[in-house]
């Protein structure tokens, strides 16, 4: 834990300048690139790590290594990048941290292990762990997080609930009628275009208002395309 050259930082209501060792015990960290000393087995490494904390149940090493199919007896230098990442995942949650900081955590994991990792995070979150998840794979953010911060050029451009971010963005809609008709558009409808009996338009506004309007119309079909988090992210960079 580095002491700031200027400014202040508080974690769990406590200044990092006061008893930083106490704060460290409450934090789990998973770096994007994992580097360990050679010569130890995965088991030795994890048991060594557990020794820095009180009341760590070492049975958790066994259960998590089974979950991630990690051979605890293999030497660190013999492990692939993906298996080193599995070891680091176990290390980050072994002491039941109150805050978990993850930097590009799924790099090196195959799809099966990624899914098991996501399930582990969901379990940890249900136990009360706050998780900070940094990733360029925005589908992961959308799946796992309830709030997102968008960072551009080292500064935070937005911090909002995921659902709020999605609702504030432009949606594309397509309505199909039995025939073209005169309509009174609700607020938020932009760029309406008729093509025979099909109306396409952009919509910016509450989804519930759009659904209410749809129910008042005699529609054959309707399609509403919600923007994904990647589209929203790119809007902040344009």
Located regions from the model:
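Conserved ABC nucleotide-binding domain
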Residues: 6, 58-78
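Catalytic Walker B motif of ABC-type/P-loop ATPase nucleotide-binding domains
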Residues: 100-104, 109
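Hydrophobic anchor residue at the start of the ABC signature
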Residues: 89
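ABC transporter nucleotide-binding domain
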Residues: 117-203
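C-terminal coupling/interaction segments
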Residues: 202-238
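Conserved ABC transporter NBD signature motif
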Residues: 7-18, 22-23
């Amino acid at each position: 834990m580095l002491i700031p050259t200027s400014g202040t930082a508080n974690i769990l209501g406590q200044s990092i300048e006061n008893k930083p060792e106490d704060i460290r015990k409450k934090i789990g960290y998973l770096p994007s690139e994992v580097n360990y000393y050679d010569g130890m087995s995965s088991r030795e490494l994890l048991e060594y790590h557990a020794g820095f904390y009180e009341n760590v149940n070492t049975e958790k090493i066994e259960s998590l290594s089974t979950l991630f199919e990690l051979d605890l007896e293999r030497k660190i230098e013999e492990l692939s990048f993906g298996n080193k990442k599995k070891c680091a995942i176990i290390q980050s949650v072994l002491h039941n941290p109150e805050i978990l900081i993850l930097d590009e955590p799924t790099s090196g994991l195959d799809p099966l292990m990624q899914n098991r990792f996501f399930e582990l995070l969901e379990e940890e979150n249900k136990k009360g762990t706050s998780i900070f998840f940094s990733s360029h794979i925005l589908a992961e953010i959308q799946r796992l997080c309830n709030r997102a911060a968008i960072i551009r050029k080292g500064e935070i451009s937005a911090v909002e609930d995921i659902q709020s971010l999605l609702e504030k963005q432009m949606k594309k809609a397509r309505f199909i009628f039995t025939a073209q008709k005169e309509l009174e558009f609700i607020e938020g409808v932009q760029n309406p275009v008729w093509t025979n009996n099909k109306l396409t338009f952009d919509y910016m506004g509450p989804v519930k208002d759009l659904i209410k309007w749809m129910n008042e119309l005699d529609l054959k079909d309707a399609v509403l395309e919600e923007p994904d988090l990647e589209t929203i992210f790119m809007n902040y960079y344009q």
